């Protein structure tokens, strides 16, 4: 049953999504990969115009299951309206942009297709609980697989976002997330069952269903191994002093890139230490970290641009 490609369960975000960012730093330590991206800059300010366009393309694949997408893909007006409606039903959640960007990075950078559409589950009050923000899979070079559960945070302070994400992942893994409605504690066990129950929404053949189920519930008889991994996306705030904006464009980029790289390098050890303190170091972690200036207003403006 070992396979090279699952045609109906493949990544949908164009790798050109990554061209919206400057990759300032990549760190690989043990099982962990950390990538730090800076948005494009125009005249000493972050420029989100192209990001909005590419996120607009990704939004439909993020919030609609493959079967729903297939139903509406040749009806662009209805498709666009359906996407906007789903987002607007959740606009009280300031983290939606972060979850869309988490999805986009996992698909564009890791080529890790989603296997569950969390937006459809969120908008179904009978199906959703506060579990992972995304569920994807990746085939490794050795032929084995990882089932990746993603966590997204939008925080003013980078390390506060990291701490919150790792704490959430720990609760998720240990099945100690409290359900707001029932008071029950749930986590990865419940999530696996939820995903399994909705496989039909993401697949188009019995063969694909069998494959995806083998990732959710691995069997010793399988021809490949499956390990649980986690992805963390943090969108955080940076303040750019007004005097720095008066620098020449090239000088400004040098200053900003050096400042941001120094910030990340000074925190890498502590980021990995947080994983260790939660006894999660046996898992692979994929970190994607992105700064916005004036985070609250930029977050709102970008998401509104995506939904226009």
Can you say where each PLM-predicted feature lies in the sequence?
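Extended, charged low-complexity segments
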Residues: 244-308
């Amino acid at each position: 049953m070992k396979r090279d490609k699952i045609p109906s369960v493949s990544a949908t975000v164009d790798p050109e999504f990554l061209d919206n960012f400057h990759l300032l730093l990549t760190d690989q330590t043990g099982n962990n990969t950390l990538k730090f991206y800076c948005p494009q800059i125009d005249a000493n300010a972050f420029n989100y115009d192209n990001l909005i366009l590419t996120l607009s393309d990704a939004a439909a694949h993020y919030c609609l299951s493959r079967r729903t997408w297939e139903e509406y893909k040749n009806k662009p007006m209805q498709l666009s309206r359906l996407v906007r409606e789903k987002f607007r039903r959740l606009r009280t959640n300031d983290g939606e942009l972060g979850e869309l960007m988490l999805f986009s990075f996992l698909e564009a950078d890791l080529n890790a297709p989603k296997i569950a559409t969390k937006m459809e589950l969120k908008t179904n009050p009978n199906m959703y609980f506060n579990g992972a923000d995304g569920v994807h899979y990746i085939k490794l070079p050795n032929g084995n697989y990882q089932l990746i559960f993603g966590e997204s945070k939008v925080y003013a302070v980078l390390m506060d976002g990291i701490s919150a994400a790792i704490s959430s992942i720990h609760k998720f893994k240990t099945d100690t997330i409290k359900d707001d409605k029932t008071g029950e504690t749930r986590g990865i066990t419940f999530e696996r069952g939820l995903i399994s129950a909705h496989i039909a929404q993401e697949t188009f053949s019995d063969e694909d269903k069998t494959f995806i189920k083998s990732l959710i519930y691995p069997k010793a008889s399988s021809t490949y191994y499956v390990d649980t991994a986690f992805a963390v996306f943090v969108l955080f705030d940076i303040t750019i002093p007004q005097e720095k904006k008066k620098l020449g464009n090239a000088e400004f980029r040098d200053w900003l890139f050096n400042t941001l790289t120094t910030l990340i390098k000074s925190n890498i050890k502590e980021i990995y230490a947080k994983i260790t303190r939660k006894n999660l170091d046996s898992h692979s972690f994929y970190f994607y970290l992105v700064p916005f200036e004036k985070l609250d207003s930029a977050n709102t403006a970008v998401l509104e641009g995506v939904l226009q």
